[in-house]
Structures are given as structure tokens and as C-alpha cells.
A protein has these predicted regions:
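Caspase-like cysteine protease fold
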Residues: 569, 575-597, 631-671
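Catalytic-core domains of enzymes
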Residues: 482-560
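Eukaryotic all-alpha helical interaction scaffolds
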Residues: 14, 18, 34-35, 54, ...
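Structural signature of alpha-solenoid helical repeat junctions
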Residues: 22, 55, 91, 131, ...
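Residue register of alpha-helical TPR repeats
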Residues: 25, 58, 65, 94, ...
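Catalytic-core segments of thiol-dependent peptidases
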Residues: 484-486, 533-609
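Amphipathic alpha-helical protein-protein interaction segments
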Residues: 8, 276, 301, 312-496, ...
Length: 671
């Protein structure tokens, strides 16, 4: 029985008895088993008993590993020094592996890579598979620190293969988790989160490896999913305390997470010279002094502090300066804070419309840029920041490559619709609406919106007329609406108008002539025998097997895509909403990768949260419901929709009684 492959069984089956040699073996097995379970204090006690019993060098090696895991580097090195004179062959190679791991922790990645590369050759020669995996993992960590991400991923993959072959599936799952960390460094947050999830499913036990929770929380926070990040950090903190492990970045990460969730308490308690925490403490003059020097994020925080200490005119100028800086360097934080501050200062209808648009588009996509050079430059910049190194030259590289790459996805050019427009915006609990009709803009407060939405949804569910149009919309047959807050849940088409619902003005596409289109039909698990076969028979087109790769390939360049699949909405970040397919979820970020997104999408079996991902990718119109749709009524409803699909806003209107609306530009000019 292997103490590493099945540590719990080892603990249950092992007794410290017999001869001196048998007792020493038992103590060593128990120590290693408890290391695997993250019980470092217990593991250390068994190893110390073995050391007192025999003085064998293997116990020094085990204690060196335990102390390294605890962050006690000097004690770990002392054990290695004591063991060194007694080591030969395989044991000596293991000690060299531990010294290589020390170099990783000492932020000397190139020395660590060289040392571990030599050790890997030795361990392969001895056939020491478990320690070979240790060395590969260590070299992968060193290559992460050196921003050699492809090679790091290869090392973690190789270690995963070795560990699976010797039956250490929990540690193999940790290697998959490490590959998620590589994806996070590369800027691909969705891939990072997917690998973290896959690692957990593969057997990664976060109770014995709570640092995995810290990695996951960091990715969630970077993706803007602050609530989820805080949920993950809370048990991580308790587990690390129980395991007597020190993760220095945990307190800072926890404070940042709380700060971005509106709780400055932890940041104020940490204090120090961190600019973000100084801003939370109200030290505006000190932070504003950073707006002309230092890393981009520090300068942007300086402009935010300048805005907070200035009069209205100066504050708006400071917000614009901070946003220009972030635009030049593809920066994110504190973009949303800058736009929120400016929105609070906006007075006229045009100002509110402008800053509301800036605020709506203040979330950066968690996808890596399509230009490999830019992706690499951003990776190098992230690592330099993490290690406290110089970043100004790297920021210049990012700016240069960003300007050369340009943007992809939603167009940056804003075209105001010729139709009447209503832009709703919530700021500090207050709902306001900017109405633009015939070029004239008007600003007004909109009270009791939650009640209006609730009454409208109840009316639709009961089959009654909805009476909220007068309170929300101008007197026009056709209107463009940009909702905010609870109004995202409004069944807009049920208000008796032809309503185009868009996330922001950047999503409006001028109407264009219809053209022959390719139709794609997709039915998810449990819905294969519902409306899709009948629709395909009437309208033609291809029916696609509900596997993610097949679905994505079929959607490229399609005219109309009909998806009958259940889904789940993530309100914090729509790119993490998903559809359920046979091989797992199809995320919004998968849709965002489409080079040629479909023209029109119909989501017949899930609520409208995923519409945003299609519109961000470039789809012109999405027909979806804000209410659960009874399966018994879907088939007849979808027949009516597809007979009018060339005019999506009219197609949505005929099924408004089921809560469907048209998201995007739902008008075309007939051929």
C-alpha cells in the first residue's frame, strides 16, 4: 500500500510496533500520509519521532518537505544540510529536488529551472516516479515565474501523467489545477476556472490543499465575480489556519475582495503603503500624488483620488484622464470606479447618457487578446507586478501592441438609433431614464421600478395585459431600450410596443437587407424530442449534436441558430452564464470566441441571461424570455417565431405572452 496513493487507508492500517526498523517504516509512512492530507503538524510529529528513533536521513528529508510547505525555509534548509552527508543515489537526487524547490520559492526561477532540469534527468534514471513528478511540478512553478507559460503547462501535464500512472490521482488533479493557474497567468480566466472545476471533479481535495482555493478566489476576483470570490476565500482562510500554513497574499487578496464589494474594513486594518488601501482610508492627497508616476493601476487610482478631491469640473476631467490611461494600456481596475464617480456628477440628459454608456462598458472581457504578442506582453506585465519588479517598459510594450492589434467584438463606434431611445441607469439606488426622441434628450426619475417589474411578470404569467408602458416608454410604436438593474427582468415585448432591448448603444446595429441564411437547430439534454424536429422539417437546415465543439463550429457564420437547451445565468458576469449540453456547459466566453457569430439566435428553453454573450460577440438579434417557459407551450410558440424570423422584433412580439423579447437590433429592411 502506498502512503501517497491512499493516505487515509495507510493511516487506518499502520501501527507503530515491531522491530526498530518496522517502527521506523511505520512512522515514515504515517508522516508521508499526513503530509498528503495536509496535516502538517501531525506529519511533523511522526517524522520527529522517527528521527529520534533512528536518526535516518529520510526523516530529515520529510521534515525539510514539511517545513518548506509551511513556509519555514531556513528550518527546511537546515534539515537538508543535516541529511546531506548521509545521502547517496536516489536519496541525494531527492534532496537536490528539494533545493530546486527552494530556488522557486526564493524567486530565482532561472536557477531553479537549471537545477530541476538536472534533477529530472537523475530521477528518470533511477525510475523514481513520485519524486520525478515533484521535480516537474517545481520546474513548472519556476517556468510560471519566468513567464515561460507553454513550457510550464507542459511540465504540469507531464507530472499529471506520471502521477496518474502510479495511482496518485489527488496529486494528479492538483497538476490539472496548476494548469488552470497557467491559464490565469496567460489572461484566460474562463479557461482557468474551467480547469479549476475539472481538477475538483478529478479528486482535488481542497481541505488538504487550501491554497487551491486561494488560486480559485484570485481568478474569480479578476473575472469580476466578487461575491463568489469571497465565498471561496472564507473557508480557505480557516483551512490554512488549521493546517498551520502561511500564504502571505491571502490577507491582501481578502482585503481587496472585500474592498471591491464595498467593505473597506479589512483594507483599513491592513493599512501600509498599498495605494488602493490608502484610497480606502481617505488619504486622497497622498494617492493623487501618484497620478503621474508608477504603474498604470497606481496612476489610475491617483486620478480617481484627484476626482474625489476636486470640484465637479475638475473631477470630470480627472475621470476622463484616468479612463484614457486605462484605454491606452488595456487596464481594468479602477475603470468602474471612475465611471461611477463621473456618473454621480452628471447633470444634463446628454451627460447622464454619456457616462451611463461608459459605466455599462467598464467591464473588461476575461478573454486573452487574439494577438499572441499582446497576450505574452500582458503576461510578462502581470508577473512583474506580482514580483514587485519594474513595469514601465512592459506597460509601453502593452500599449504599443494594443494600438497595433485594435479591438474585436462589439464595435467601438456608437451609432444612435433613429428610433426613439430610452436609456435607464441605476446609480446609488436611484433609477433615472434618458429619453431621446427626434434628437431631443430628456432626463427623469423613474420611481417604483421593482413594483412595475413584479406586476408585469405576474400579469404575463397570468395571461393578463401589462400596463407598465406609460411609466417607462415614450409614446411610440417602436422603441430601443437599454435597461438597468431590475429592469433586466422586464418582459419588454409584453408592453404592447415593438421593443429592441440592447445592453448598450455599442450593441445597436443599423437595419440592413435580409439575405439567404443557413439555419442551425440544437436540442440539449432532455429536450431532443421537443420542438426542434418539427421546426427543422418546416424550415430546413442542419440539426447539430449537442456537444460544445460541434455547436461552436456550426454557429460560425450561421444565419439563424435555434437552441433548445436549459441554462444558468450569472448576473455578475454574463460571460460565465452557460447552456447545458451533453458534454457539459457551453459558457458565454465560448460564444465570445466566435469569429463569425450567427445573425439571429433563438433561445427557447432558457432565460435571457445568455443573450448578452451573443450580442457581445456580434449577433444582431436574440429572441429569449425573462420567464420560465412551460415545455408544453414552446413548440407552438416557436413555430410562430420562425415564420417571422426575418424581423426578430415582430417575431418576439407574437410570443410576448410567454415573456419573450427581442434583444439587439430586431429590424431588417426587406430585400
Amino acid at each position: 500500500m502506498s502512503a501517497t496513493a491512499d493516505p487515509r487507508a495507510t493511516i487506518d492500517a499502520t501501527a507503530v510496533r515491531g522491530t526498530k526498523a518496522q517502527r521506523a517504516d511505520a512512522l515514515h509512512d504515517l508522516s508521508v500520509a499526513h503530509v498528503e492530507l495536509g496535516h502538517l503538524d501531525v506529519a511533523a510529529r511522526y517524522a520527529q519521532r522517527g528521527l529520534r528513533l533512528t536518526g535516518e536521513a529520510r526523516f530529515h528529508l520529510t521534515l525539510a518537505w514539511i517545513d518548506l510547505d509551511r513556509g519555514r525555509r531556513q528550518q527546511s534548509l537546515a534539515h537538508l544540510d543535516l541529511a546531506a552527508p548521509h545521502l547517496r543515489g536516489r536519496e541525494l537526487a531527492r534532496a537536490r529536488c528539494l533545493r530546486g524547490l527552494h530556488l522557486c520559492h526564493a524567486a530565482e526561477p532561472r536557477l531553479a529551472i537549471a537545477e530541476l532540469t538536472a534533477v529530472i534527468k537523475e530521477l528518470r534514471r533511477y525510475g523514481d516516479e513520485r519524486w520525478l513528478a515533484n521535480a516537474l511540478i517545481g520546474r513548472g512553478i519556476a517556468r510560471c515565474n519566468a513567464t515561460q507559460l507553454a513550457r510550464a503547462d507542459a511540465d504540469f501535464t507531464a507530472a499529471q501523467t506520471v502521477l496518474q500512472a502510479i495511482g496518485e490521482h489527488a496529486r494528479a488533479a492538483m497538476c490539472l489545477h496548476n494548469r488552470g493557474f497557467v491559464a490565469m497567468l496567460a489572461g484566460d480566466l474562463p479557461l482557468a476556472l474551467r480547469r479549476y472545476e475539472d481538477a475538483a471533479k478529478a479528486g482535488l481535495d481542497s481541505t488538504s490543499r487550501p491554497e487551491a482555493l486561494v488560486d480559485r478566489a484570485e481568478a474569480l476576483l479578476a473575472a469580476g465575480l466578487t461575491t463568489e470570490a469571497r465565498r471561496v476565500l472564507t473557508p480557505a482562510l480557516e483551512l490554512l489556519r488549521r493546517c498551520n500554513r502561511h500564504v502571505p497574499e491571502l490577507a491582501v487578496l481578502s482585503a481587496r475582495c472585500a474592498l471591491r464589494d464595498g467593505d473597506p474594513g479589512p483594507a483599513l486594518r491592513l493599512g501600509g503603503s498599498d495605494v488602493e488601501f490608502m484610497l480606502a482610508a481617505g488619504k486622497l492627497d497622498a494617492v493623487a500624488a501618484h497620478r503621474f508616476r508608477g504603474p498604470v493601476q497606481t496612476r489610475a487610482l491617483g486620478w480617481l483620488a484627484q476626482a474625489r478631491r476636486s470640484d465637479r469640473r475638475g473631477a470630470l476631467a480627472a475621470c476622463r484622464a484616468g479612463l484614457r490611461l486605462l484605454d491606452e494600456h488595456l487596464g481594468d481596475w479602477p475603470r468602474r470606479e471612475l465611471t461611477s464617480h463621473a456618473l454621480g456628477l452628471a447633470r444634463t440628459a446628454r451627460e447622464v447618457l454619456h457616462w451611463a454608456e461608459q459605466h455599462r462598458t467598464s467591464w473588461r472581457s476575461p478573454l486573452p487578446p487574439p494577438n499572441p504578442g499582446l497576450a505574452h506582453a500582458l503576461t510578462a506585465l502581470r508577473r512583474a507586478r506580482a514580483l514587485g519588479g519594474p513595469v514601465e517598459a512592459l506597460e509601453r510594450d502593452v500599449r504599443r501592441l494594443a494600438l497595433a492589434t485594435g479591438s474585436r467584438g462589439v464595435r467601438e463606434t456608437v451609432v444612435l438609433p433613429e428610433l426613439p431611445l430610452v436609456s435607464f441607469v441605476v446609480h446609488k439606488g436611484r433609477m433615472r431614464a434618458v429619453t431621446v426622441v427626434n434628437g431631443r434628450a430628456r432626463l427623469r426619475d423613474v420611481p417604483h421600478v421593482a413594483t412595475l417589474v413584479q406586476e408585469a411578470r405576474l400579469a404575463v404569467a397570468a395571461g393578463r395585459p401589462v400596463s407598465a408602458a406609460e411609466a417607462l416608454l415614450p409614446d411610440a410604436e417602436e422603441v430601443v431600450v437599454i435597461p438597468d438593474g431590475v429592469l433586466h427582468a422586464m418582459p419588454w415585448a409584453a408592453l404592447g410596443r415593438r421593443v429592441h432591448v440592447i445592453p448598450s448603444l455599442r450593441h445597436w446595429r443599423p437595419p440592413r437587407r435580409s439575405r439567404p441564411c443557413r439555419r442551425i437547430w440544437i436540442a440539449g439534454p432532455g429536450l431532443e424530442y421537443e420542438e426542434v424536429p418539427a421546426l427543422q422539417q418546416e424550415h430546413g437546415g442542419r440539426r447539430i449534436t449537442p456537444f460544445a465543439d460541434d455547436v461552436l463550429a456550426a454557429m460560425e457564420g450561421a444565419g439563424v441558430v435555434h437552441i433548445a437547451a436549459h441554462g444558468e445565468v450569472n448576473t455578475d458576469n454574463p460571460l460565465f452564464s452557460h447552456l447545458e449540453l451533453k458534454d457539459g456547459p457551453l459558457y458565454g466566453y465560448d460564444i465570445a470566441r466566435l469569429e463569425h457569430p450567427p445573425e439571429v439566435v433563438v433561445l427557447s428553453a432558457c432565460e435571457s441571461g445568455l443573450a448578452r454573450a451573443f450580442l457581445d460577440a456580434g449577433t444582431r438579434a436574440v429572441i429569449a424570455s425573462v420567464l420560465p417557459v412551460p415545455d408544453a407551450r414552446v413548440s407552438r410558440a416557436m413555430t410562430r417565431v420562425h415564420r417571422l424570423i426575418d424581423h426578430p422584433v415582430e417575431a418576439a412580439a407574437v410570443v410576448a405572452d410567454l415573456g419573450f423579447s427581442c434583444y439587439g437590433t430586431g429590424t431588417r429592411v426587406a430585400a
